[in-house]
């Protein structure tokens, strides 16, 4: 049968540029992080898990999310938010209250966290796939990012 996974051809699992690299389509490879101001003192942060071709996966995935004082994502912030809840996906485990979480995305590979911070403290939002501990870090969140 040649190259196969569970009796199926690899062609069924690969697409686009990922196929030329031998990477499986639909396998979590990266996290895209975006944000938007919400209601007063709230920022909504959305995490989309993509495959190596940059296509959002169509299945749940686990990601680690934390707030950091460092642009590199090193360590958690010393100034935690008031609350962090999930409006899309779910929080599976709180490592450090309002600073570090394990999140499961929705069936569309998306999670949105609602962060409330009355002090609007500056911190970086970071996320990593369990299979790749290198953090994805977005810009410094500050007063202007909150509602």
Indicate residue ranges for each PLM-predicted region.
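Short, hydrophobic beta-strand segments
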Residues: 96-120
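Short S/T/G/P-enriched beta-strand
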Residues: 2-91, 120-123, 128-147
